[in-house]
Amino acid sequence: MSGHNKWSSIKHKKGAADAKRGKVFTKLIKEITLAARTGGGDPDGNPRLRTAIAAAKDENMPKDNIERAIKKGTGDLEGVNYEENTYEGYGPGGAAVLVESLTDNKNRAVSEIRHIFSKHNGNMGENGCVAWMFDKKGYIEVEKSAAEEDHLMEVAIEAGAEDVRESDDTFEVITEVEDLETVRQALDGASIQYAFAEITMLPQTMVDLDDKTSEQMIRLLDALDDCEDVQKVYTNASLSDSVGEA
């Protein structure tokens, strides 16, 4: 299993539990609100909003919640003014960590994120210290049991996917950001079920971590992911096969 695939899978399994506590909905609402604020409330003309709505529907968010979040973004309803920022640093073993934040209090967010890095054997760096190690891409994970490789490859590439990669127990469909929804819809049309689809930051190269360091890295990533001001967390750590399987 690739390092990106490993953390993504752990994160989404964790998200299923978090959803019961409302954490996933909170993050999705923030993203929908900001997407509508920056690009308008019409998903047909706003790819970021379209992707955010699709993610919300995947999590079974009620339609009313989605519509309210859009209206808060467009100003039709009063809402919180979120600020978007990216923070960068290093985790255990020197692996890069990229943190996307949406917050109504930047000072609180910076302080909390810096504290989490320090507490978990990492350190927050300057802007630009690790961002260059990642590429922004669309990413769709398909369980091997859900599709034949040749069929998936044919459908995905025909729809505009950049690559289809094989991992231990999944296929990873990679797209340009603007092609993610088209490829997702093509998979839906071909009745190919996928575990999740998202816009992500794919690492260009990976940093191998041993069992102990992988466990430390997971604790850092989990703590960042649990921070109320954090939307997404990315790493180029190649995590040990022994972690995250429970």
From Swiss-Prot:
InterPro entries: Integrase-like_N, TACO1_YebC-like_2nd/3rd_dom, TACO1_YebC_N, Transcrip_reg_TACO1-like, Transcrip_reg_TACO1-like_dom3, YebC-like
Similarity field: Belongs to the TACO1 family.
Organism domain of life: Bacteria
GO biological process: regulation of DNA-templated transcription
Localization per record: Cytoplasm
UniProt name for this protein: Probable transcriptional regulatory protein Dole_0371
GO MF annotation, one: DNA binding
One GO CC term, this protein: cytosol
Record keywords: Cytoplasm, DNA-binding, Transcription, Transcription regulation
One Pfam family recorded for the sequence: TACO1_YebC_N
